[in-house]
């Protein structure tokens, strides 16, 4: 027994002397909802500038995934959910390295089922629950764990707030109703994913507390408040309408009272519509031509010369009547009644 202990102790002391690097410690795969993270811890070693390389087995050969990283974890979420994998990691320093540390892993069996999301609606003496399964890493938003596991269900646990007695119910649907609860009582609820065929459970969600109502009667103080508010709103509305109409009436009355009234003759004219029609037709149409009279004035001397033809031969030719012949467009002077002049009038259009 003593030789074995001495050999083991000698080998342990020779490790730092020969420069051998110890492997990573506490290597494990931490997978939640198919987010696969390989984690480890830095080994006890005098030098602190160690790096690490992590690999996974693909088609019977290992592929580097995280090479010479100073981190103590490596993300393997890209792996298929239905395969069996061997992943490994080692510590490195310059050209030296430690032994590999292997971990076997099957995502669909080993991943941890995270807590679902839950919404609660209080209705009378019951609580209506709605669930959402956890989403899958590196998949579209519509993909959840329910799309991966055919036997997916929800396990609901609820209890009255302040008590230790808990009740459970399992539902394969995305909703559940907790009935026959005590009215006006606060209940706390939490939910977890559950695989019926594997009897495998996930993590519990955080408790959510909600108060129930009462379907039979509504509290009298609520009815009183609603009634008072309704009456007050109607009263204010009617009062506002009355004030607006009163202001309009006062403004209209003041306007007509202070304004000047129409003249009496204009009121009489407007009171007989046929006067307006007569006034309209009293003006000539715009296309009608103007009418004027041409007046000719003939003196007695001119008339006498016409009666003595012999005198006309000896006399000089008659002179231009000049200004004694006038044309007037609108009006012409009329001769006096005692003037023996002959007036002739012709109309031209």
Swiss-Prot record:
Give the stretches traversing the membrane.
221-241
Record-level GO BP terms: defense response to virus
Check the record and name the SUPFAM superfamilies matching this protein.
Answer: Fibronectin type III (SSF49265)
| Record-annotated Fibronectin type-III domain positions | 23-111, 112-215
UniProt-recorded Gene Ontology molecular function terms:
interleukin-10 receptor activity
Subcellular location, principal: membrane
Q: State its role.
A: Shared cell surface receptor required for the activation of five class 2 cytokines: IL10, IL22, IL26, IL28, and IFNL1. The IFNLR1/IL10RB dimer is a receptor for the cytokine ligands IFNL2 and IFNL3 and mediates their antiviral activity. The ligand/receptor complex stimulate the activation of the JAK/STAT signaling pathway leading to the expression of IFN-stimulated genes (ISG), which contribute to the antiviral state.
Protein name, entry field = Interleukin-10 receptor subunit beta
Organism of provenance: Mus musculus (Mouse)
């Amino acid at each position: 027994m003593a030789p074995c202990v001495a050999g083991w102790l000698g080998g342990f002391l020779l490790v730092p002397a020969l420069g051998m690097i110890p492997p990573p410690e506490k290597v494990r795969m931490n997978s939640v909802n198919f987010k696969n993270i390989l984690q480890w811890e830095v080994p006890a070693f005098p030098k602190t500038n160690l790096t690490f390389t992590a690999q996974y087995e693909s088609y019977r050969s290992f592929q580097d995934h995280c090479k010479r990283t100073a981190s103590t974890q490596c993300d393997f979420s890209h792996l298929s959910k239905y395969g069996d994998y061997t992943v490994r990691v080692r510590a490195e320093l310059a050209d030296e390295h430690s032994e590999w540390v292997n971990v076997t892993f099957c995502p669909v069996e080993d991943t941890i089922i995270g807590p679902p999301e839950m919404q609660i609606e209080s209705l009378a003496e019951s609580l209506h629950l709605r669930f959402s399964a956890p989403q899958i890493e590196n998949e579209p938003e519509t993909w959840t764990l329910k799309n991966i596991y055919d036997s997916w269900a929800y396990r609901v646990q609820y209890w009255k707030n302040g008590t230790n007695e808990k009740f459970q119910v399992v539902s394969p649907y995305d909703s559940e109703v907790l009935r026959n609860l005590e009215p006006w009582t606060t209940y706390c609820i939490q939910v977890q994913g559950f695989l019926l065929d594997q009897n495998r459970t996930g993590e519990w969600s955080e408790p959510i507390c909600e108060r129930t109502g009462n379907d039979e009667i509504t509290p009298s103080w609520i009815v009183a408040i609603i009634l008072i508010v309704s009456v007050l709103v109607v009263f204010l509305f009617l009062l506002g309408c009355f004030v607006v109409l009163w202001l309009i009436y006062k403004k209209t009355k003041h306007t007509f009272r202070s304004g000047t009234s129409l003249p009496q003759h204009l009121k009489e004219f407007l009171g007989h519509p046929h006067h307006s029609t007569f006034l309209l037709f009293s003006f000539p149409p715009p296309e009608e031509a103007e009418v004027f009279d041409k007046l000719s004035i003939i003196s007695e001397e001119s008339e006498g010369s016409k009666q003595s033809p012999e005198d006309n031969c000896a006399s000089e030719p008659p002179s231009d009547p000049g200004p004694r012949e006038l044309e007037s467009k609108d009006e012409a002077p009329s001769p006096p009644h005692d003037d023996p002049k002959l007036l002739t009038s012709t109309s031209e259009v």
